[in-house]
Amino acid sequence: MSEFDFKSSNFFDFTKKEKHFEYLNRQYFSSEFYFGTGASHASAANFFNKRSLITNSICYSLPRIYLKGDFVTFKKIFCLKEKKVLSLEEIFNRVSLATKLHTHSISEKSESIILIDNDEDEILDAARDFLNFSEQKDENELLHKYHQMRKDYILKNKFFSNKDTVDFHEFFINCEGSVPKNFLKTYLFQNELLKEISNKIGFELKKKYLI
């Protein structure tokens, strides 16, 4: 891992230490939750039974969240051909694209897309929903719709149905997890706000890349 210049009383870099795995496991064990990306180390949070808040995920169907108390936000996908940000509904309807994203075999150039990171407001909003989460609260109707889209996509996708066991398939289908309410309001379906965001991003990309 390359070094980076960051100093804080709450930040400790143990990556160069001899017992870095031991330090990592201790940290997972003593932490209240995991906050980071959906890279492989996010799986350790599940092993230690810790809640997870994952940002900038591109695994729209299975973003390493398994319980209702786990939260995820996704990268935005700007389609260069259509000059817009794709809604989650549109991503799931494009089975090939969603599968390439899930398997991390995506090529932005060949797919004519640009992946855009979550901005500060999206991450802050996700953290707020994550910290205020309660099992007793009424569930979000949009979250139900997201999970139904995800399940429908998995059921019609050969990548999942060709797995060796029924248990494996059922595990993916029945995974639960939460997506921030405001994120779903903005990105689950095409709407006027998403059109405004698309126009703004398209304008910035045009200045930067002359698309």
Enumerate the predicted regions with their spans.
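Catalytic donor nucleotide-activated moiety binding site of glycosyltransferases and closely related
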Residues: 1-20, 144-152
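Intrinsically disordered, low-complexity boundary segments flanking structured domains
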Residues: 2-3, 62, 98-102
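Conserved beta-strand scaffold positions in the cores of enzyme catalytic domains, especially
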Residues: 11-13, 52, 71-72, 113
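Residues at the C-termini of beta-strands that transition into short coil/loop
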Residues: 15, 56, 75
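Residue-level detector of flexible, active-site-proximal loop/helix-junction positions
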Residues: 18, 59, 78
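A structural signal for well-ordered alpha-helical segments within the folded catalytic domains
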Residues: 22, 39, 43, 121-128
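A donor-sugar binding/catalytic signature common to diverse glycosyltransferases
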Residues: 24-71
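Leloir-type glycosyltransferase catalytic cores
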Residues: 68-211
